[in-house]
């Protein structure tokens, strides 16, 4: 048989405030029922975690990253990208080619299609498990701002200040 334990390092400053910390703690409790010990280590020293990742000694880790509205996947997933070389170790010529094709185009619809293919490949590699999608909350006072002029579809990638020139103040 294989190992019946694994450590997952969480980059939450040792305070349990990383969004994945609670989910991993609950998963650890559930896995104990079937005899697997998932050790959740909330790292107070981020350098200790990145050193383990870079050395290839981390079983698993939970960190967060965000992308721009038109993300460039090179740094995270390309074979020669900075994060991939130390975190994922993906060496996939098809993935590399798709990433480079996307980098060479300014057509966002085309890039979106390529990025979808890239993410399908990454999912097949099973090197990461999406745990959450961050959402921001923005509050405006109707006494101070004409709400009809606020960006209608605010996302984490397109915020109200991207259309600040359209805002009417009361």
Positions of predicted regions on the chain:
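Bilobed periplasmic-binding protein-like "clamshell/Venus-flytrap" ligand-binding domains
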Residues: 1-15, 61-64, 106-142
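A glycine-rich, aromatic-flanked flexible loop/lid motif
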Residues: 64-69, 88-91
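Extracytoplasmic/secreted proteins, especially bacterial periplasmic and envelope-associated proteins
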Residues: 19-33, 48, 52, 57, ...
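Composition- and surface-driven signal marking solvent-exposed, interaction-prone regions
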Residues: 22-24, 43, 76, 113-118, ...
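Ligand/substrate-recognition segments at binding pockets and active sites
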Residues: 1-67
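Short linear motifs at secondary-structure transitions and domain/linker junctions
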Residues: 35-38, 105-109, 162-164
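Short, solvent-exposed loop/beta-turn-alpha elements that line the ligand-binding surface or hinge
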Residues: 1-3, 51-56, 74-104, 133-170
């Amino acid at each position: 048989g294989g190992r019946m334990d694994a450590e997952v390092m969480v980059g939450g400053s040792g305070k349990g405030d990383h969004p994945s910390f609670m989910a991993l703690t609950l998963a650890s409790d559930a896995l104990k029922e079937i005899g697997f010990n998932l050790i959740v280590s909330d790292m107070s020293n981020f350098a200790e975690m990145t050193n383990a990742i870079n050395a290839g000694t981390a079983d698993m880790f939970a960190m967060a990253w965000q992308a721009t509205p038109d993300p460039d996947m090179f740094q995270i997933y390309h074979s020669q990208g900075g994060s991939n070389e130390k975190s994922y170790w993906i060496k996939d010529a098809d993935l590399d080619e798709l990433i480079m094709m996307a980098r060479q185009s300014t057509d966002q619809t085309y890039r979106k299609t390529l990025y979808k293919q890239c993410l399908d490949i990454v999912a097949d590699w099973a090197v990461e498990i999406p745990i959450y999608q961050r959402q921001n909350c923005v509050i405006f006072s109707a006494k101070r701002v004409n709400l009809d002029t606020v960006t209608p579809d605010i996302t984490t990638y397109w915020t109200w200040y991207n259309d600040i020139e359209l805002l009417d103040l009361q």
